[in-house]
Swiss-Prot record:
Molecular function in Gene Ontology: 3-deoxy-manno-octulosonate cytidylyltransferase activity
Annotated protein name in UniProt: 3-deoxy-manno-octulosonate cytidylyltransferase
Subcellular locations according to the entry: Cytoplasm
Matching NCBIfam families: kdsB (TIGR00466), PRK05450.1-3 (NF003950), PRK05450.1-5 (NF003952), PRK13368.1 (NF009905)
Function of the protein: Activates KDO (a required 8-carbon sugar) for incorporation into bacterial lipopolysaccharide in Gram-negative bacteria.
Gene name linked to the record: kdsB
Keywords: Cytoplasm, Lipopolysaccharide biosynthesis, Nucleotidyltransferase, Transferase
Species of provenance: Bacteroides thetaiotaomicron (strain ATCC 29148 / DSM 2079 / JCM 5827 / CCUG 10774 / NCTC 10582 / VPI-5482 / E50)
Catalytic reactions on record: 3-deoxy-alpha-D-manno-oct-2-ulosonate + CTP = CMP-3-deoxy-beta-D-manno-octulosonate + diphosphate
GO BP field: CMP-keto-3-deoxy-D-manno-octulosonic acid biosynthetic process; lipopolysaccharide biosynthetic process
Pathway(s) the chain acts in: Nucleotide-sugar biosynthesis; CMP-3-deoxy-D-manno-octulosonate biosynthesis; CMP-3-deoxy-D-manno-octulosonate from 3-deoxy-D-manno-octulosonate and CTP: step 1/1; Bacterial outer membrane biogenesis; lipopolysaccharide biosynthesis
E.C. no: 2.7.7.38
One cellular-component annotation, GO: cytosol
Enzyme class, UniProt record, top EC level: transferase
InterPro entries: Cytidylyl_trans, KdsB, Nucleotide-diphossugar_trans
Length: 250
């Protein structure tokens, strides 16, 4: 089975313009993401809509493909990139361009989901720990996931799901395992073509979570598990946290 990694990277981010080109420990954020992915998948490309990002990727020796500025989601950008790249890839892996510390173990966990021939789409979760403050669970920028017994996603929400009616909130993390969604997706190539042709759904628009479009249309999302904490960079403040993490790790 052949896996193609695509890293969507936009220049015009609302909260952090030029984020992929921000420097982190002497390298751009997009270079760090690319280097984490290279070698784990059969091939990897950055998919961008900006010539500055294209030039930066070529400068460090990475592969890059130009895509439209009109895409509403990273999945749409992945599909255009996939059609331009070509090849006989079975699965396309969508790696967030703002996750410079994505780990090989996480990519391998998503790949393992496709050992099940019925898997259409796969993603990752990380369990919240019982000692985390309740505010972490309440964070609307950290979507939660509920799963069925077969490790398929039932629903994703920015709200806390499930709501424990008969327990104090301070005890929720002790009485139930909550899962944080990690925004790493993989799709069988033919499924990627299908889901990008779907119109936006009511649940997707309500939560601003594109994966709800797929669930609402009957697609199954297989979930792999990771114990690695991710550090996404959405704001300049997040970049400072990433710099501290990098210093402490070295």
């Amino acid at each position: 089975m052949k896996f193609l990694g695509i890293i969507p990277a936009r220049y015009a981010s609302t909260r952090f313009p030029a984020k992929p080109l921000a420097m982190l420990g002497g390298k751009t954020v997009i270079q760090r993401v690319y280097e984490q992915v290279a070698g784990i998948l059969d091939d990897a490309y950055v998919a961008t809509d900006d010539e500055r990002i294209e030039a930066a990727v070529k400068a460090f020796g990475g592969k890059v493909v130009m895509t439209s500025i009109d895409h509403k989601s990273g999945t749409d950008r992945c599909y255009e990139a996939c059609t331009k790249i070509g090849g006989d890839f079975d699965v396309v892996v969508n790696i967030q361009g703002d996750e410079p510390f994505i780990q090989p173990s996480q990519l391998n966990a998503v790949k393992a989901c496709f050992e099940d021939p019925t898997t259409q789409i796969a993603t990752l979760v990380k369990p919240f720990t019982a000692d985390e403050p309740f505010a972490v669970l309440e964070n609307v920028n950290s979507p939660k996931v509920v799963l069925n017994k077969n490790w398929n996603a039932l629903y994703f929400s920015r709200s806390i799901i499930p709501f424990q009616r008969n327990a104090d909130k301070e005890d929720w993390l002790k009485g139930h395992t909550y899962y944080k969604h990690i925004g790493l997706y993989a799709y069988r190539t033919e499924v990627l073509k299908e889901i990008t042709a779907l119109p936006q759904s009511s649940l997707e628009l309500a939560e601003s979570l594109e994966q709800l479009r797929w669930l609402e249309n009957g697609y199954k999302i297989k979930v792999g598990i990771s114990d690695v904490e991710t550090i996404g960079i959405d704001t300049p403040q997040d970049l400072k946290h990433a710099e501290e993490f990098l210093k402490n790790r070295s």
